[in-house]
Structure formats: structure tokens, C-alpha cells
């Protein structure tokens, strides 16, 4: 039986810059995953450019709930450390029909039909 995964990352959602276009792309990502009946949504890292604004958080929470109403969601924190763990924690607390898991450290995450090794890679500083 095939396993369908929908994956994106490095969104860098920013209220002051291309917000409408980025929001439209996110909406397409969610709707396409739902249409294809994916088994897991994965969003890895850099959801926003800096600490999220209320508008950015609200959009992400709405999107995560839509995804979780159709399949489990894995959120992996980014490699630049620009989004605060508090922003991601709020997303992980959102509720849907399926599980939402936040990964801030490397770990093996098990879902119903698959296990995923999530790894937060930090940017090297010189």
C-alpha cells in the first residue's frame, strides 16, 4: 500500500514581504495534500523569517489545523533559529483530528504507518 507524504520547508513567511503570495502558496500546499489524500504532512524549518507576528501565527495555526484534520503533521524547527521555539510550541498545541508533533531535536518520530527521523540542523557559525 503506497504511502503519500507532502513536504515543504524554508517558507520564511513574513508579514511585511510577499505575505499574500506566500499565504496563497501555503493554501495550495495544504489543499493539494488534502486532495491527494496524503498520509503525512511534513514542514521543516524556517516557517517565518524572524519572531512571528500575530498575523503570521494565525495563518500558520489555521494551516496546521487544516492539515491535522486530514493527516498527521510533523513540524521540524529550522536551522537558522530565527523562529522561536515558543512560536512552534503554539503550532504544536493546535488540535486537529490527527496528531501534530513538534521536533526541536533529532529524534525518531513514529506515526501509524511510518517512522521519520527528524533532525534540526543548526547553521555553523565562523
Placement of each model-derived feature along the sequence:
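Binuclear metal-dependent hydrolase catalytic cores centered on His/Asp/Glu-rich metal-binding motifs
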Residues: 27, 112-126
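Active-site beta-loop-alpha junctions enriched in small/polar residues
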Residues: 10-12, 78-80, 119-123
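Beta-strand-turn-beta hairpins that frame and shape the catalytic cleft
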Residues: 1-6, 108-118
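Mobile, glycine- and charge-enriched loop segments
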Residues: 1-22
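Core catalytic region of metal-dependent phosphoesterases/phosphodiesterases
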Residues: 15-110
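Bulky hydrophobic/aromatic packing residues
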Residues: 11, 88-90, 117
